[in-house]
């Protein structure tokens, strides 16, 4: 048995479910989740708009509500995503070149490949994630630092992909 006592649920669990508590908790999660999603959507829109002002940057995936509120993937022509990530890290900004579940492989992202990106576009992409704990000030910081990094790396890159 999971809980000892009465014979509910064929002896596996004692007691009666608190249905009103379950329904109330579900509603609280829904309300809290909706406000978090709206907040992250605003941060995401601000970040995307700022990123697209950087020359030769492409948003991977759709721009609107058809994407997750907490995830942005962009490609920077002629700059390896790993190089951008290294510089971002030096400024205290976390990014990745793929999902956490593919971090131990050198394979290109199957998701980016499935939406039609070339090998070069995939290798020049980075992923930025947002949470309900991020602030507008942090988004502004990324948008202040990242264009400088991109400009510096493009000057250092003699070969255009």
Where are the regions that the model predicts?
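Pyridoxal 5′-phosphate
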Residues: 1-161
């Amino acid at each position: 048995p999971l809980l000892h006592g009465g014979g509910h649920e064929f002896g596996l669990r004692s007691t009666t479910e608190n249905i009103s508590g379950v329904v109330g908790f579900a509603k609280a999660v829904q309300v809290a989740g909706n406000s978090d999603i709206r907040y992250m959507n605003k941060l995401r829109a601000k970040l995307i708009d700022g990123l697209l002002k950087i020359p030769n940057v492409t948003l991977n995936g759709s721009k609107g509500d058809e994407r997750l509120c907490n995830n942005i993937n962009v490609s920077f022509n002629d700059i390896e995503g790993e190089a951008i990530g290294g510089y971002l890290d030096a400024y205290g900004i976390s990014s990745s070149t793929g999902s956490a579940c593919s971090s131990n492989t050198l394979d290109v992202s199957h998701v980016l490949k499935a939406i039609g990106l070339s090998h070069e576009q995939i290798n020049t992409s980075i992923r930025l994630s947002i949470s309900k704990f991020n602030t507008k000030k942090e988004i502004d910081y990324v948008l202040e630092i990242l264009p400088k990094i991109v400009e510096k790396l493009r000057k250092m890159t003699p070969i255009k992909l």
